[in-house]
């Protein structure tokens, strides 16, 4: 992890490069993503299956690309008690939070009898994209599916890349707990295209939500208008500002928690004490040694 001091040349150079790091990413991927989306829109399942073979290394069919009820039951049975408790605890907290955000229809009649108001109607079908190529993200399942369910969305489908046809059981269990209606083993721009346009197997949705890599983000940007989207999320980033009085191990853990998502992630600490910065850097090194995703986090840091 680099240690930079304000006032020196390399400090301003680093800040400028950090600010520009996402500027050209979308443009470089647009051609590839446009071809993928066009193929899925034109050829449906045939293109989807071909792209899945190419990128995820397995041969799906209209039956195997959808997670079966038996696979979900098996995943739930494989959960350790601690994992189940953690997922259910998180799900309960997320639901409580979003219940307070629920909007309701309302109306009133003004002085001349004109009725004014607002009708709040949930979407029919929402598609959730959950990353899964390099790690499992059950939190992404809960944080996207539960708000949709609370809002009253009629049908929630989920797409998640499955290298060699494998999906992490914890992700499947999280989808079960969150009330996801259908899960598809497909990722990347092709998954976004399938949910945006619909195929013979995957239904068209009204809105696509959830994070992903640069190809997923570019695809979401390109299908916006065909469907609604939540946002165009770039690589993970975190900036911590400290006066040097915090706990170095906590700050190191927060930095690593974002750095492990992606080699392109940005994890930055700004503080007024060089001694404290060095303590945090030392702690980052110690914690990295214990991390299964040490290589990815190390590259980001």
State what each model feature region is:
Residues 108-173:
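Conserved small-residue-rich beta-alpha loop and adjacent elements
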Residues 267-301:
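NAD(P)-dependent aldehyde/semialdehyde dehydrogenase
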Residues 1-124:
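N-terminal Rossmann-like NAD(P)+-binding subdomain of aldehyde/semialdehyde dehydrogenases
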Residues 143-146, 172-175, 200, 224-226, ...:
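Short, solvent-exposed amphipathic alpha-helical segments in soluble enzyme
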Residues 168-179, 196:
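N-terminal small/polar loop signature for handling phosphorylated ligands or for N-terminal nucleophile
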Residues 179-266:
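Conserved NAD(P)+-binding/catalytic subdomain of aldehyde/semialdehyde dehydrogenases
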């Amino acid at each position: 992890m680099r240690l930079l001091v304000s006032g020196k040349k390399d400090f301003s150079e680093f800040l400028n490069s950090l600010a520009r790091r996402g500027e050209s990413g979308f443009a470089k991927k647009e051609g590839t993503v446009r071809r993928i989306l066009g193929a899925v829109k034109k050829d449906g399942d045939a293109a989807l299956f071909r792209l899945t073979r190419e990128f995820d290394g397995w041969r799906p069919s209209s039956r195997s690309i959808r997670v079966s009820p038996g696979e979900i039951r098996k995943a739930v049975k494989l959960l350790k008690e601690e994992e189940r408790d953690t997922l259910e605890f998180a799900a309960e907290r997320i639901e409580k939070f979003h219940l307070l955000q629920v909007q309701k229809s309302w109306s009133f009649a003004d002085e001349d009898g004109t009725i004014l108001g607002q009708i709040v109607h949930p979407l029919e079908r929402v598609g959730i994209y959950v990353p899964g190529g390099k790690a499992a993200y059950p939190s992404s399942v809960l944080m996207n599916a539960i708000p949709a369910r609370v809002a009253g969305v009629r049908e929630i489908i989920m797409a998640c890349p499955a290298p060699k046809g494998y999906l992490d059981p914890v992700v499947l269990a999280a989808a079960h707990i969150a009330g996801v209606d259908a899960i598809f083993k497909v990722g990347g721009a092709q998954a976004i295209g399938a949910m945006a346009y619909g195929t013979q197997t995957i239904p068209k949705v009204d809105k696509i939500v959830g994070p992903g890599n640069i190809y997923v983000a570019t695809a979401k940007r390109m299908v916006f208008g065909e469907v609604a989207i939540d946002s165009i999320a770039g690589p993970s980033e975190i900036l911590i500002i400290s006066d040097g009085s915090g706990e170095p191990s906590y700050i190191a853990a927060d930095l690593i928690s974002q750095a492990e998502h992606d080699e392109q992630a940005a994890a930055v600490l700004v503080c007024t004490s060089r001694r404290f910065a060095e303590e945090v850097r030392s702690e980052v090194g110690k914690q990295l040694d214990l991390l299964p995703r040490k290589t990815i986090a190390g590259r980001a840091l």
